[in-house]
Amino acid sequence: IISSALKNAEDILKKSQISSWRLDAEVLLAEALLKDRSEIIIRDDLKISNKKAFTFNRYIDRRKKFEPVAYILNNKEFFSLDFFVNKNSLIPRTETELMVEKAVKIYKNKNPNVLDIGTGSGCIIISVLRHLPKSRGIGLDISNDAIKVAKFNSERLLKVYNKRIKFMNLSIEKLSNNR
């Protein structure tokens, strides 16, 4: 039953000193059950299959070891888009959305070329290009694994606009030496 699974998970996370124990337990259970968080709170008498309980327990085991929820679920919302994230990219920060919002506002009626250094998941450049449809951009990262994450997000989120963006496995030092 949802209520007992949730209570047990909350106790585990609280004991592990996870500050957002309740929210994390609810989010992880909702994902394991493929339901909205509000539904698991309202319909807490629903039964959980063994398979979904196993998935949920794996999520809780990872979270109690302080693995971020975004890495457990391989997902982080940024600027109203759902980005794939993993250990190869930093988790997009809420404060960074303010920077993207400001850039979109400043360049709304212009077509800037965008350079994203340390692109990671590609959240900044992809979000900017989604809102500036005539702009083009390049995302750089020294990690080839991060570039793979950014390309994956670009293909998913930019779709037909993908020809406007290029990702390169390159450090800023090499870029400045190639002048």
Annotate each PLM feature.
Residues 18, 132-134, 156-162:
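Short helix-capping segments at alpha-helix termini
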